[in-house]
Swiss-Prot record:
Organism field: Variola virus (isolate Human/India/Ind3/1967)
Protein's job: Plays a role in immune evasion. When secreted, inhibits T-cell activation by preventing the binding of host CD80 and CD86 to soluble CTLA4 and CD28. In the infected cell, may inhibits host NF kappa B activation.
Keywords: Early protein, Glycoprotein, Host endoplasmic reticulum, Host-virus interaction, Inhibition of host NF-kappa-B by virus, Secreted, Signal, Viral immunoevasion
Places the protein is found: Host endoplasmic reticulum; Secreted
GO biological process: symbiont-mediated suppression of host NF-kappaB cascade
Modifications the protein undergoes after translation, according to the UniProt entry: Glycosylated by host.
InterPro entries: Poxvirus_M2
Protein name: Early protein OPG038
Complex and partners: Homooligomer. Interacts with host CD80 and CD86 when secreted.
Length: 220
């Protein structure tokens, strides 16, 4: 009886002495659940008239808790990094809106709104109006969100940039792969919005993504 009591005491003590540690989910080759983490709108000063199938290409990586995605298409290279995060990018889609605006939908493995991260965006003009760095600073907040976002724009082709994190709306007509499940933030107050403009008012950089047609970015 005494032996059993001592054994139970040791087991209980061992259980309380183990420190809880976060674990990192093992990487998958093909993620089935896509979270709509961000929508990026970019205005350019050359003509882009409609969504082109097969125009966008992507590569992604996850190194030292930093999730990175690089997109090329429509004369732009977009490089985005979410720092110190458990999630990684799984997919992206691009669509062309009115007045030479490009909309980019970004999908990750989990939501952003519970843990706030630092975000870095680099946009480079690849085909027209290439040149020196036009803008290198924080992206101002238009809706309060406990994240910082810095942006670098290389070249002079960009007229405006707007980034919305944890959007509450998703394009119902987006033809995502049938074996994927899309989900998104449903709490209006958990969104974040950042924007900068060089020509028009910032509200001219906003698009109704429900009216656009998108094509998924192909992996390189």
């Amino acid at each position: 009886m005494v032996y059993k009591l001592v054994l139970l005491f040791c087991i209980a003590s061992l259980g309380y002495s183990v420190e809880y540690k976060n674990t990192i989910c093992p990487p998958r080759q093909d993620y089935r659940y896509w979270y709509f983490a961000a929508e990026l709108t970019i205005g350019v000063n050359y003509d882009i008239n409609s969504t082109i199938i097969g125009e966008c290409y992507m590569s992604e990586s996850y190194i030292d808790r930093n999730a990175n995605i690089v997109l090329t298409g429509y004369g732009l290279e977009i490089n985005m990094t979410i720092m110190d995060t458990d999630q990684r990018f799984v997919a992206a889609a691009e669509g062309v809106g009115k007045d030479n605006k490009l909309s980019v939908m970004l999908f990750t493995t989990q939501r952003l709104d519970k843990v706030h991260h630092n975000i870095s965006v680099i946009i480079t003009c690849m085909e027209m109006n290439c040149g020196t760095t036009k803008y290198n600073s924080d992206l101002p907040e238009s809706i309060h969100h406990k994240s910082s976002c810095d942006i670098t724009i290389n070249g002079s082709c960009v007229t405006c940039v707007n980034l919305e994190t944890d959007p509450t709306k998703i394009n119902p007509h987006y033809l995502h792969p049938k074996d994927k499940y899309l989900y998104h933030n449903s709490k209006y107050g958990m969104r974040g919005s950042y924007g900068v403009t060089f020509i028009d008012e910032l509200n001219q950089c906003l698009l109704d993504i429900k009216e656009l047609s998108y094509d998924i970015c192909y992996r390189e």
